[in-house]
């Protein structure tokens, strides 16, 4: 009996997760912080697509720009991740401590991705390396 209840519970959770999907949204439907971020850092770049991932807990947003940039925001419009297809992540986005570390240790390398985690920051460089920093901006990991 416990197995049947467990199986039904698992199937119910799976069905709810599978039902959560991306829904197209307009620029105006994005959280205010996300709109400000986009207009401040990508003035004049066309938004190709914006969507809301309506998951079980809190929705989040994904925006794709005409230059190939992909940006993820949380429910409140705070940046979660930015990925550049060409060029570097705009300089005002990455914390100065992270930028200084990259500049001092990796000359002629661009920051292509920047991700904000609960306890860390992560950047992916144009040379393929991924650097992970704690919230005190100390390097805690390198992955290639």
Name each model feature, range by range.
Residues 21-144:
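Interaction-mediating elements
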């Amino acid at each position: 009996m416990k197995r049947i209840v467990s199986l039904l519970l698992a199937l119910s959770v799976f069905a709810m997760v599978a039902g959560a999907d991306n829904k197209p949204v307009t620029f105006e439907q994005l959280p205010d912080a996300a709109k400000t971020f986009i207009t401040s850092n990508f003035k004049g770049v066309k938004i190709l697509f914006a969507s809301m991932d309506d998951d079980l807990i809190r929705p989040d947003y994904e925006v794709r720009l005409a230059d190939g940039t992909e940006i993820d925001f949380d429910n409140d419009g705070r940046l979660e991740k930015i990925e550049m297809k060409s060029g570097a992540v705009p300089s005002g986005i990455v914390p100065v401590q992270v930028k200084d570390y990259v500049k001092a240790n990796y000359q002629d390398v661009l920051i292509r991705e920047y991700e904000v985690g609960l306890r860390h920051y992560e950047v992916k460089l144009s040379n393929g390396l991924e650097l992970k920093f704690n919230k005190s901006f100390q390097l805690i990991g390198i992955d290639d």
